[in-house]
């Protein structure tokens, strides 16, 4: 097994209070206990979340003391657990190389490279949850100590992601912010009709029952259809309720709205009838 020469002290940037940063050139490097993991920091990124911690310090929701989810006796064994007014080390976008592990650590290999996953959501604080770089010291230091009992979820997932040697350390550390960007902009809307939902059908002209039945068979069947149309319309398998006008229908009352037509005023009115996470479909039939 690969062995590393580990110094007794290190350089670290510590946050000691609101807007109070200190460069500590002799911060002790703690040797790992039985369940602990020591990583050498290869790269760390900083983001606006770190600025909020800088300004709020102990008032930040993730700097609070853990309230449940782990035995307090375990937390007392971890020198990198730094809640409340205890100085912390920021930096949650971190790439590490494991240089030492305790004899009871499983699944984490000395010499291996990892991206640190940040949020320990099974360990709640009063207003949020425990997190690497907040109430546990982060990566703005040369070495960081983690505890497997903290970073392992109730489902058994260890919050260290193996990182390829083909990527630069900074590229690995950027996974976390890019994942936030992707999550913020990813589309999660339904792409089919809501089975068992409420559907509104509005038609300026006629509807082909056969084609519409095939459409429902392919994309999902609502529990009930409300229809506003000049011509009669019925289905064998789904109750159809007729309404005289769109205006008399409740706001945000329908999971799926289908408009057979192209009248701008009608289309604008229909947007107000869509429920949260609902869909609207325009069938123009060649019109504009």
Locations of regions flagged by a protein language model:
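Glycine-rich phosphate-binding loop and adjacent beta-alpha segment
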Residues: 261-288
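Glycine-rich beta-strand-centered segment in the early N-terminal region that forms part
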Residues: 28-44, 59-120
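Mid-domain Rossmann-like dinucleotide-binding core that forms the NAD(H)/NADP(H) cofactor-binding site
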Residues: 165-246
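NAD(P)H dinucleotide-binding glycine-rich loop of Rossmann-like/cofactor-binding domains
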Residues: 74, 78-83, 118-197
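Beta-strand-connecting loops/turns
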Residues: 35, 111, 196, 252, ...
């Amino acid at each position: 097994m690969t062995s590393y020469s580990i110094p007794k002290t290190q350089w670290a940037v510590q946050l000691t209070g609101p807007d109070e940063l200190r460069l500590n050139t002799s911060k002790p490097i703690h040797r790992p206990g039985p369940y602990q993991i020591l990583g050498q920091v290869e790269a760390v990124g900083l983001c606006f979340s770190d600025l909020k911690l800088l300004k709020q310090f102990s008032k930040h929701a993730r700097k609070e003391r853990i309230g449940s989810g782990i035995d307090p006796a375990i937390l007392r064994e971890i020198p990198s657990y730094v809640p409340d007014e205890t100085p912390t080390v920021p930096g949650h976008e971190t790439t590490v190389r494991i240089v030492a592990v305790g004899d009871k650590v499983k699944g984490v290999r000395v010499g291996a490279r990892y991206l640190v996953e940040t949020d320990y959501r099974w360990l709640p604080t009063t207003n949020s949850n425990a997190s690497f770089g907040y109430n546990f010291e982060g990566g703005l230091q040369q070495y960081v100590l983690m505890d497997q009992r903290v970073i392992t979820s109730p489902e058994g997932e260890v919050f260290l992601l193996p990182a390829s040697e083909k990527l630069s350390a900074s590229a690995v550390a950027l996974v976390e912010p890019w994942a936030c960007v992707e999550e913020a902009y990813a589309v999660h809307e339904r792409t089919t009709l809501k089975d068992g939902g409420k559907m509104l059908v509005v038609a300026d002209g006629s509807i082909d029952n056969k084609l519409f039945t095939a459409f429902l068979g392919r994309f999902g069947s609502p529990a009930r259809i409300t229809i506003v149309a000049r011509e009669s319309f019925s289905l064998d398998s789904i109750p159809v309720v007729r309404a005289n006008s769109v205006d008399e229908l409740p706001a945000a009352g329908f999971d799926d709205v289908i408009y057979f037509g192209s009248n701008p005023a009608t289309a604008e009115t229909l947007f107000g009838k869509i429920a949260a996470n609902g869909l609207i479909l325009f069938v123009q039939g060649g019109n504009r």
